[in-house]
Design a protein with these regions (language model features):
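Conserved acidic/glycine
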Residues: 2-62
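A short, conserved beta-to-alpha structural element at the edge of catalytic cores
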Residues: 178-185
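Cofactor-binding active-site loop characterized by glycine-rich and histidine/acidic residues
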Residues: 38-42, 46-178
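Short intrinsically disordered, low-complexity coil segments enriched in acidic
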Residues: 1-2, 179
Length: 185
């Protein structure tokens, strides 16, 4: 993806440099995330979805944009609002829905539910119901990449509540001091 000069307040033709098919794909992906969360939310309100459910409606662009810049070998960690991150990283919509309904065909065989999604095959290291818990996981994975000499990065999605957790400051400090391949969003 092209890099934008932070001092340039105008997009300066950046959007014109991206292929239209790529941009349409991003829009399609954002729509998939929005519609899937809205529909499962409607079903949850009718009592059809077991367990807790945390939706990410309105957060689609961050997930899709970040994951569009990743390579298949790159990894992500997520929050309790993980559905969009899972799908944006390449997770199967069928596996996600099966997981939310507690079915064996789910990405965690129906045991993880909405807040505990994992799919190592696509580099989705996990979502977590504990505020800020993805931060040290992302740093540990990035440290593993560094130690093994592997060329992949970790993107760590987190919410504003994580800023008040000790793990937030510890993780950012460790990542900076050791110059680890991790991006915090």
């Amino acid at each position: 993806m092209p890099r934008r000069n932070i001092e340039n307040t105008d997009y300066g033709g950046m959007m014109e440099t991206l292929p239209k098919i790529f941009l349409v794909g991003l829009l399609r992906d954002m729509r998939l995330l929005r519609v899937s969360d809205e529909r499962v939310g409607e079903r949850a309100r009718r009592g059809e979805v077991p367990g807790l459910l945390h939706l990410g409606v309105g957060e689609e662009a961050v997930a899709v944009g970040a994951c569009a810049a990743l390579r298949p070998e790159d990894k992500i960690t997520s929050t309790h609002r993980a559905h969009g991150h899972f799908l944006a990283k390449g997770g199967s919509p069928k596996a996600l829905m099966a997981e939310l309904y507690g079915k064996e065909a789910g990405c965690c065989r129906g045991k993880g539910g909405s807040m505990h999604l994992v799919d190592m095959n696509i580099g989705f290291l996990g979502a977590n119901g504990v505020v800020g818990a993805g931060l040290p996981l992302a740093v540990g994975a990035a440290m593993g990449a560094r130690i093994k000499g592997e060329d992949w990065v970790v993107v760590c999605f987190f919410g504003d509540g994580a800023n008040n957790e000790g793990a937030f400051h510890e993780s950012l400090n460790l990542a900076a001091v050791w110059n680890l391949p991790v991006v915090f969003l």
